[in-house]
Amino acid sequence: MTIELINEYLKEVSVLFKEINHERNKEVFSPEFELPNIDNKLVKFFSAARAEFCSLGSYKGKNITLLNLMKNEETQTTKTLASLLMVARAINHINKTGESILIFTPSSGNKAIALRDAVNRALEIGLVNYKQLRILTLIPEKSVHKIRTSKLTTNKLLNKLNPICVYKGSESQQVKTIGCDFYANYSKEIFERSNTRVWYSLDINNYKVADALRAYFCYQYFPSNQQEKRQLHAHSVSSAYGLLGYDFGKKKIENETNQLIRSGYLLIQHLDTCDMVLNLLYGSFSRKLMPKYTLDKSTGLFKQLNNHFPLETWDVNESLESTFYTHKPSTSFEMNRLIEANGGSGIVVSMYECIKNIGKIREMLKPAGIQIPIDIRDINEWSLIMAFTGVINSIDRGIINEFDDIVVHGSGFYTKTDYESVNKNILHYVESDEDIISLV
């Protein structure tokens, strides 16, 4: 079952926008939570936000369903949904005020990919012109391979107006600090000289409504199962925006229908940033609470016995997927409360475990038309593989026995053969916010 998620639930988007509009931080710029007038161009613009449910059969008695949020071939990530709504809000602000907008997004990769695609899409469809809407992205160096070629890179004028900055430092999360500094130090100056608002776009509310639509789709797809069975929503996470948004939508549906939706949550992370799982299990982000690994010299693997962490790994601090770079996310505490109230758990996976399960996952995903390459070195986005590895391990280890149905949120998967990587000659390497201002 495939739908255009935003177009299908435009009425719900408007209702949810009104609800969270009062939460906007008035001390920093952000467009109102309001869409432009709906016309054929906007419907075409939103049509990229496709989603699909696909039954994958069962695994050890658990029904497995994929919620595929990666249907936009230009991004192959769930961030498309929120990015389209954000750009639509920007267009609405431009139309109402005459001001231009520069969207600024520090990102580990996928937010930048999706927002750049949404801006490019708006320009191509003619919803706005290249002077009115621009995008500035800042990514860590380890994520450069994720960024795609588009008209924003191949057209010289658009490339100049929509620069890609790359942070050369070792701490990927530092792009957020640089982003905050840039906004604080230069947004006023940019507005005064060019009538352009800088929109620092990382606020969770920018993603909340798009992610809430998952709950409406789920309610439509599983109408008879909502009360009869326990449903677990599994997601590879950095800050768990997707699951928090789903829960926001779920609560709205419960209020509207007076029905209880019995869904719990499974957080899946990698060792480098397993902060949410640590905090869920132990109430702390301290890595001192990590299980103690012992090197098995006969295999070269580090091993331990805590079922919530990799039983075997090549690296006890492994960065499996550069998408996940956030330490000590503020969202962790709200997610803990949701899991305490609804059930669920958290699990950390390793590359070794992903590879160990890759054949099984390849077969599971065939009904969804998702092809895992034989040469796994071609994979440039591991979120989906991590999610399925986490689900398989959780079932095998008895972590999620109380749930009957498992919905895996497919948030990102692509290989190097799916797209043309950006030419590195057009990237701007920076070390601080001072290096960025000359580009805008």
Predicted regions and their residues:
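PLP-dependent amino-acid enzyme catalytic core
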Residues: M1-V440
